[in-house]
Amino acid sequence: MEPLLWHVDATTPSHIQALQSGSLPPASPAAALTRVQRALSFFRTAARKYCKQADAPDLFALAMTRVAEHNDIAVDARNVEQLFHFVGQHVANTAERKALRAALREQRALFKASLPGACFPAPAPPGWGIPKPPPLPPPFVWKGCRYNVVAPPPRIPQPPPLPKFAPFVRNNFRVVAPPPLGEVYQPVGAPFPQTRASAALSFFRTASTCRQVLVESCIQQPAFMTCCASTGEVQEMTSMLTEARQTGKILTPKEVSQALAQKRKEIKGAEENRISFDEGVHLTEADVFHRLSLAKRFMAHKRDRTLVDVLMPTEHEVVRYPGTRPDGTLQMCVSALPRMSEEAARKLLEKGWKNSKNVSLDIGVTSYMPYGAPIVAFMTIMDGRTDDPQEAALCANYMDLGREKSKVLSLPLVTIPLSEIEHDQGILDCLYIVTYFHGVQSYQPGTLMMSYGTLEFQEYSNNSFTTATRVRESWDQILKRNENLGKRVHAGIGVLGTIEKEMDQQLEDFPAINLETRPRPVVRTFQNAHQPLHKTRSMRIGTTSFTGNTGRTVLPPVVKTYEEGNANFDSLQSKPRHSSASTAHLMCAVTVVPDPTCCGTLSFKVPKDAKKGKHLGTFDIRQAIMEYGGLHSQEWCAKGIVNPTFTVRMHAPRNAFAGLSIACTFDDYKRIDLPALGNECPPSEMFELPTKVFMLKDADVHEWQFNYGELTGHGLCNWANVVTQPTLYFFVASTNQVTMAADWQCIVTMHVDMGPVIDRFELVPTMTWPIQLGDTFAIDRYYEAKEIKLDGSTSMLSISYNFGGPVKHSKKHAISYSRAVMSRNLGWSGTISGSVKSVSSLFCTASFVIFPWEHEAPPTLRQVLWGPHQIMHGDGQFEIAIKTRLHSAATTEEGFGRLGILPLSGPIAPDAHVGSYEFIVHIDTWRPDSQVHPPMFSSAELYNWFTLTNLKPDANTGVVNFDIPGYIHDFASKDATVTLASNPLSWLVAATGWHYGEVDLCISWPRSKQAQAQEGSVSITTNYRDWGAYWQGQARIYDLRRTEAEIPIFLGSYAGATPSGALGKQNYVRISIVNAKDIVALRVCLRPKSIKFWGRSATLF
């Protein structure tokens, strides 16, 4: 503020009386002092029109200087008032004031909360500033036991009288020392410490006077400028001369400079990193700093006093795996490295400490990777005040995450000025950590890799001149390394031997990376900000090989320098230029990296007003791989059958306002018939099959990774067949709440990992009969989007607990794999877990509570909060235990329990928003408890397949024949009326793709005549191929009077397992009935012995 005042005063014409006195000559020092007083009074009075702060002149000077520099103008007396009022209008705005100085918020709050009686300036002109304060209250009287104290009334501070200078004459120059400041009384109810305001104003007055006198002296005596020294140098030289006089030797100025240079202390090994492999090595304050006795502390000169402290600014900061970029390069992860809190820095500043030096930084890392895993982390400490990586990178190190603990220590990193925290808010958090991971094979992005904590040793000084320090001189005194590497098992009781996983796996070379700085935030200015360039500078770090002392076994490299040459390189064979593949690819750009995992693409248009159930696109996996070609199709053709892992990546632009979600359904057995569904994809029907729902608000690239064998139970053949056709269906899962500007394009890429070679078609069965569940069962079921209206209604939403048996949807009945499995028992109990994803627009938000409920009537909030519940705020996970009157819910019936959803608060949306708050519930896992539930049928496990009535025998022979093949399907015949039965066995066959095993075919029939009058027989034979070929096995003939028969049959085909349909020539059972007109009905039942099922699917009927 003071230089700006003098610049304005120097440009003020002599005839202007607003800033100078007319009674004194303009050239006299008294007149200069009067001008300074008037200038300060003008700025104080004008500044308080906009801001009630003690340091308002400094605030306005900073703002005016920045505005003048931005507009390329000079501040003088002609434009100072206009510029001041322009800046004041911006400072009056809370946002602009916050951008200038965040520290003023605390003072502003104190001012508003201050008591009446604070000193106020002269009345402001009409229309400026805040309302005038209320009149002063009567004096406050506090009565004690024996005395009365009356607080004096507040008084407005008056400018001090003109200082009287005591001249001190020297040979070549003159120094004027101002008188000491007087005591300033702080009135009751002052909004801020009066000592700070008085000290600031006194400093400006004194500094302005001294500056004026100094300028006049420099003009009169030019030699004075060559003799001016800083205050610290004068004091240091004075003390050295005094010490020399006492010892009897007078030093020359050159000898004094040499003596001062010898007093500097430098730490050996600064800017180095030291890695300690011992978990027991911990630095203490005594290891880093010299201890001083109390006598030395108090006898030391004030300028040489230091304060040391040990802080732990970071206790537990986690670092997750960021994944790799689409081109395969490593991606960085930025994490915080704070120094101290702003409150702690202000307390140190109030005590007089100006600078904070980072003496030593101890970073401890805890790895969450398996022991011995060859994963390396590259950690770099960066300076956030620069965008140049070469300047920002302070120190870096490679960490072996195969060891649980790692530690890194480094000597001085940076010194920060505590006195500038108000002007530069980025000082306290100027350091951050950039981490790269290498060696990760299959961990998903977001996996927790490690965590770190920091221990910081700081030294504070009260000035910038002193060279005193308490830091020890070398690394050897700070750190004593103690390596403790060895076996996993060191000792034990009764241990004869140990088997341990290899810990010394060779570390792979860390690839080259582009070290970048963190993005810069947007800084608000007084003028319109220009659009920044979307470019960042980077620093290339080459490939690093770990062949030194890493604690792991190092494999000797095999280098072949010349082909077919001896030690003398006699037979050196040259190759033509650009003849090798490695040099041929160098002609391409280094940033263009082909993706070796991509095996197919799909593009489709999304309507701007996409409606729920809209079919967007179909992706045939087998056809896409063959058409895409490349290494994957060649490898697939060579292996014939593989068990791949697919990754579906949908590239859709992130948009949190559309309120749109797109789903992807996997169908391997041609169960989805789009024409039968009206060329639409109803979400309730599609969700019965394996599905993944993508919300456009979550990311720009949405991924779904699944293993083909886990979903289908078998390998993927490269030849097309009539049974399997792996297909992905993309459709709109929820209607977008905000209509887009136009139809937009979406790209889907399919990526594959072929996996190891397999030698069989069937893999691990998905389910075996009899059904046996483990500790958990994967339901994996999405439910159609629920919505909470904006009309303020609090009606309860629910999801029924009938998780078994067929269910009726909007267009079709459906039976899924999870419904078929859970329908074997009459009831179920336990805990269900899942997630909730909001598919609503960002304009609409709400919170709700999830709870178990049984009744139709909605509960009260007290009933909900008394029981198990979970409050959801947007997206989140939940786990709810079932709660019914009998602790269980019926598997195939409604009304015995439901998952209740009750709006809690909201929804909140703008006035123009017309949609509701929508969310999708996904039930992932069921965890049964110890409750026992009986099966649906008796322990005999006999299930009816079909019943034949109205038999139509041949008119001539009176015989009727029925062929029952070796696979379970919907039996049909033209010679009788067929009634198909429905039971858990038939549901499981319909919900899977393949089955195989042995069953007993149980046949029974009622007759219409009495036993003694009954004539006829039933012939049952096992056959293969056509009947005329007579490939027959067992053949039995039963009298019609017996009414029942049993015969075993194998379910399968030439491929092993069989689908629910004909697959080549299969074995079958022929039933021939003589005199069939006397049979009322023929029932065919199945008694399973051992059946295996493959594939998670569903059937729509």
UniProtKB/Swiss-Prot annotation:
Keywords on this record?
Answer: Capsid protein, Host cell junction, Transport, Viral movement protein, Virion
- Give one GO molecular function term: structural molecule activity
Transport is among the record's keywords = yes
Q: Tell me which InterPro entries the record gives.
A: Nepo_coat (IPR005054), Nepo_coat_C (IPR005305), Nepo_coat_N (IPR005306), Viral_coat (IPR029053)
Gene Ontology, cellular component aspect: host cell plasmodesma; viral capsid
GO terms (BP aspect) = transport of virus in host, cell to cell
Pfam families assigned to the protein according to its UniProt record, in alphabetical order: Nepo_coat, Nepo_coat_C, Nepo_coat_N
Q: Which domain of life is it from?
A: Viruses
Asked if the record carries the keyword DNA-binding, the reply is no
- SUPFAM superfamilies xref list: Positive stranded ssRNA viruses (SSF88633)
Q: How is it modified after translation?
A: Specific enzymatic cleavages in vivo by the P1 encoded 3C-like protease yield mature proteins.
Comment field (misc): Virions are comprised of 60 copies of the coat protein.
Q: Which family does it belong to?
A: Belongs to the nepoviruses RNA2 polyprotein family.
Q: What is this protein called?
A: RNA2 polyprotein
